Amino acid sequence: MRYQQDTLFPYALKNVEEYLKANWNEDATKTVVAALREQADEDKKAEVEGALTIPAGDSEDIIPDIVKYVEWQTSRDAKTGSLKTLQGLVWAKGYKDGSIKGHVYDDVSKALEQWTEGGRKIYVYSSGSVDAQKMLFEHSEQGDLVKYLAGHYDTKIGAKTEKDSYEAILKNIEATAEEALFLTDVVAEAKAAKEAGLNVVVLERPGNAELSEDDRKEFTVVKSFADIPLESIVESANGAGAKRKIDEAQEEDEAQPPTKVVKKDENGDAAAKKDETAKVDEPAAKATNGDAAAKEEAAAPAEGKMEVDEAAAAAAPPADAAEEKKETEEAKPETEKVTEKTESTAAEKKEEDKKEEVAESKEAAPKEVVAEEAKKEEEVKAAAPAEEVKKVEEPVPAEAKKVVEEEKMEVDGGAEAVAEEKEAEKKEEDKAAEPAAEKKPAEEAVVTSTEEPAKEEPKVESSTAEAEPAKEKPAEAEAKAAPAETTKAEVVEKPAETPAAESMETDSEPSADKEAEAKPEAKPVEEVKKAEAEKKVEAEKKPAESEAEAKEVATKPVEETKGEETTTAGPVEEIAVEAKEDAAKPEEKKSDADEVSTTTTTTSTESKTENGTHENGVSKEATPVNGKEESRVPENGEAEPAAEAVVTSNGNGKHEEKGDSDKENDTATSNTTEEPAANGNGVENGSTTSSTTTPAPDAAAEIKSKKVIDSSTTPTPPIEAES
């Protein structure tokens, strides 16, 4: 530094004007002059204090302005490239003519030689230009030292006080910061190099600025190259580098231990998880086995299920006993539900099979007619504000079937005796019933919801009518007291509430004047009209007697469901023996056959007749033809003929002259009380009203034998009840 300040810089200022004049036309001179002019302009724009300008032009007249600018830059110790270039050109001339010699300290030459011989590379990084550096070491006071130098760097690579400059040099020489040692006498440059990671040694030469204690503490300070502990510095540098590497490795290790710990934990967790997985798998397997057992139990009876559960609980470990118990308790209700459902399903299937067997024995034609009629009835009800009708079906107990069979046998054996004992009584009752049936108009078949008792009801032919009048009249009162605003009608088919022996026949359908006469052969329309006229005459003569006997009638209550009335008109079960014996008796008269007795029976579980077909083998078929439902009977007298069942469903009470029944709304032609019919409808409170016509002797035989009469229900369209 002292050499530059004392020798080089004064030499450049003294020889710059001479150099410019001697070399003005040289390209190097022209280039450096242009660079100085640009620098002056920049300083002017930057408003640097004391900034000078260089006039434009190529004449030598501007040389004095150039000299003034160089002096101003040197006074500021500026290290601009243009200034250093011009100084180097002037120094080169002085080095060539020997005017000046490059000054180096005595220890420099020996150190450079030793370091080079040791295989180390030496580079020069100076604020002076590369050319000036070379000239100085080439023309040094100790000879040519350029041979010890591997390279030169000036401010073109960057300022010496900037970190990036040193990083750029390291990149250029392909070395790491730990492998490099930077020697300088300027603390600012030392700090920049240190920031870049280089090893730094500060040289304290005579004439340099004093170093502070902090600087000495921060850096290694030496006074000569010989004092530089290069080996130790290199070792320390290597050690430092190694230390840095070790530190970095430790830092990496410090970062890695958690990973290793995690790995250990993972390994530990893996073992723990393996154990837990094994434990979890066992309950899972048990649960699976439990599920399988539960499924098997659902298919098996409840007793088998209990055994499986007990075996599973015994096989389970004590630790899982509570869980298994809980699962078993949860599975039990489901199994019971499944068992009950299976049993109920089996029962339903059995009933369906029975229904199918009964249905197969019936003719297809009545079914189709009934289905069509039912469909029409549903459409009519959907259009009008009709009420919902529910039907509750109950299975027929086996005991009822057995009673029916026994009663059939009793009827077969004692039919003749019964006919003889009650023949006289029946004749009288039949005669009394004739005028009542003729006098009672068809309009009275409609049951109203008022509490006024029916004063004129047809006579009931029943052996139990006299025995139990008090019992059945309260029931009739209850039926009439039912509210007329009923919105739903339920048809409940239940087992008979009274024994089969006490089956009663009531006349609840006073439409005898509308029914055809029951004869072995159907009478023509003219005879029917004639018979009706005669009956009306007789009815007028005996009003008092008819009224008195009508009061003794014990009928099953019929509950009105707001405009809906259901009546039953089905064929009466007949016995071949009775038919033969009754046909042979001379006491029978043709007028008796003309008599119409309407019988109403409580729906019984013992009856199993649909559409006129009975299980005892004697059958009648009620075949609806063109709106008529008539009982077709063989003419040989083997079976009792049933009169035409004419049911008015329009509620006008007028019988039809031709015996046609309003079948358009009839949906119960195939109903039975014993087997639930597919299209059956009935009345509320579990009872149906049956309208059946039989000759007097046959009816008497049925009453004595306590025979259950089959009934079918025929719903009528809504009729507004009189309030």
Swiss-Prot record:
What UniProt keywords apply to this chain's record, in alphabetical order? Answer: Amino-acid biosynthesis, Cytoplasm, Hydrolase, Methionine biosynthesis, Nucleus
Q: Name one GO biological process term.
A: L-methionine salvage from methylthioadenosine
- Annotated stretches, region: Disordered: 239-723
**Domain of life here?**
Eukaryota
Q: Does the keyword GTP-binding apply?
A: no
Coiled-coil stretches: none
Subcellular locations according to the entry: Cytoplasm; Nucleus
**Positions of substrate binding:** S126, S127, K160
Pathway the protein contributes to: Amino-acid biosynthesis; L-methionine biosynthesis via salvage pathway; L-methionine from S-methyl-5-thio-alpha-D-ribose 1-phosphate: step 3/6; Amino-acid biosynthesis; L-methionine biosynthesis via salvage pathway; L-methionine from S-methyl-5-thio-alpha-D-ribose 1-phosphate: step 4/6
GO cellular component assignments: cytoplasm; nucleus
* Composition-biased stretches (Basic and acidic residues): 262-284, 293-308, 322-406, 419-443, 468-479, 487-496, 511-565, 577-593, 653-666
Q: Which family does it belong to?
A: Belongs to the HAD-like hydrolase superfamily. MasA/MtnC family.
Subunit structure comment from the entry: Monomer.
State the name under which the record lists this protein: Enolase-phosphatase E1
